[in-house]
């Protein structure tokens, strides 16, 4: 099952300029998802990070993974209409710079859910090369 940007916006509340998932290619509701972020020079953040050498901030790569996790968990009927809140980030490792023109492939696996809280393990790659990996704790409110 794949999701368009319009379908993604029906599931998570994020909007421009903070909507960081452009397409979902695979989804198993409540379990895992694979999606993409197309990194473009026109994004506001690149005006200041950094002039003359634009680099996607690591925290935005983490946020993109968290949003994909939100799509995965909020696709379950019992969480429809709720909001995902980032609770913690553990073991984040940044392996590669991400620049305009890159396509960031996002993969998240929901490894634990207990009540309104859960943990996802995410990896983002560019052309098969790992850019970031992290364990993300979330709350559903």
UniProtKB/Swiss-Prot annotation:
Write out the catalysed reaction. Answer: a (3R)-hydroxyacyl-[ACP] = a (2E)-enoyl-[ACP] + H2O
* Enzyme class, first EC level, given as a word: lyase
Alphabetized NCBIfam families for the sequence:
fabZ, PRK00006.1
Job description of the protein: Involved in unsaturated fatty acids biosynthesis. Catalyzes the dehydration of short chain beta-hydroxyacyl-ACPs and long chain saturated and unsaturated beta-hydroxyacyl-ACPs.
Predominant cellular place of this UniProt entry's protein = cytoplasm
Per the record, what is one GO cellular component?
Answer: cytoplasm
Name assigned to this protein: 3-hydroxyacyl-[acyl-carrier-protein] dehydratase FabZ
Q: Which Gene3D superfamilies match?
A: Hotdog Thioesterase
Cell location:
Cytoplasm
Record's keyword terms, sorted: Cytoplasm, Lipid A biosynthesis, Lipid biosynthesis, Lipid metabolism, Lyase
**What is the similarity comment for this entry?**
Belongs to the thioester dehydratase family. FabZ subfamily.
**What gene name is listed for this protein?**
fabZ
Cited PANTHER family? 3-HYDROXYACYL-[ACYL-CARRIER-PROTEIN] DEHYDRATASE (PTHR30272:SF1)
E.C. no = 4.2.1.59
Q: Does the keyword Cytoplasm apply?
A: yes
Give GO terms: molecular function aspect only: (3R)-hydroxyacyl-[acyl-carrier-protein] dehydratase activity
User: Is Lipid biosynthesis set as a keyword in this record?
Assistant: yes
Q: Which residues form a coiled coil?
A: none
Cite the active-site annotation.
49
Q: SUPFAM superfamilies recorded for this chain?
A: Thioesterase/thiol ester dehydrase-isomerase
Biological process terms from the Gene Ontology for this record are: fatty acid biosynthetic process; lipid A biosynthetic process
